[in-house]
Curated annotation (Swiss-Prot):
Similarity-based family: Belongs to the NanE family.
Gene: nanE
Reaction catalysis annotation: an N-acyl-D-glucosamine 6-phosphate = an N-acyl-D-mannosamine 6-phosphate
Phylogenetic lineage: Bacteria, Pseudomonadati, Pseudomonadota, Gammaproteobacteria, Vibrionales
Cellular compartments per GO CC: cytosol
The protein, known as: Putative N-acetylmannosamine-6-phosphate 2-epimerase
InterPro entries assigned: Aldolase_TIM, NanE, RibuloseP-bd_barrel
Record has Transferase as a keyword: no
Gene Ontology terms describing biological process: carbohydrate metabolic process; N-acetylmannosamine catabolic process; N-acetylneuraminate catabolic process
Pathway(s): Amino-sugar metabolism; N-acetylneuraminate degradation; D-fructose 6-phosphate from N-acetylneuraminate: step 3/5
NCBIfam families for the chain: PRK01130.1
Keyword annotations: Carbohydrate metabolism, Isomerase
Amino acid sequence: MGSNIDKTLNALSQGFVSSCQPVDDGPMDKPEIVAAMAMASVEGGAIGLRIEGIDNLKAVRPHVSVPIIGIIKRDLDDSEVRITPYIEDVIALKEAGADIIAIDATHRPRPVPVEELVKKIQSLGCLVMADSSTYEEGMFCHGLGVEIIGTTLSGYTTPVTPKEPDFPFIQQLANQGCFVMAEGRFNSPQLAREAIEAGASCVTVGSAITRIEHICGWFKSEVELGKKNMVKDIA
């Protein structure tokens, strides 16, 4: 297991991860399209993938050899935890071909304790990624032996989500010797570079690569702003 961990972490530390998660129920939300996104991402230079859902993971796995971070998202009635909340999710992700399994690592009410999920994932021979929202959560998981600490949920457990990524969070974790996966609002190449400069071992990029609806929305907003500015200048 030790050599497998080193091999996977070394691979991830060479670049960035493409999170191939289309908008739910959108026109791109089909396993065959997710697989195409994944293959195109690898051809473009991604050294890892983050894939949500068993059907999508099964569609992607035969076509790529790079490490895959697998997750299952659920909307629970009694918990705000969405990412891989159950033991059965962990087992299904392993069977579908995930190398790394990411879990919600926040200190919120949850159906299964973080410790149990971590233990199960590692017993199956997979690495764990802790999707954290705070330094305390990240360090708790680091103390459990979690291999990858992600900044994934920073800004998403509070009333207001910042526009910029959480660079201080990256720096704090890196200073403690964590393998840091920067994730969350890294929507430009420059921000991805700044994450590495802040101490991240790797960066996960999602919407800016694989969510066409979001990308078009960004351009739409800027073009509309430009039109308004032109009107002001004329006035």
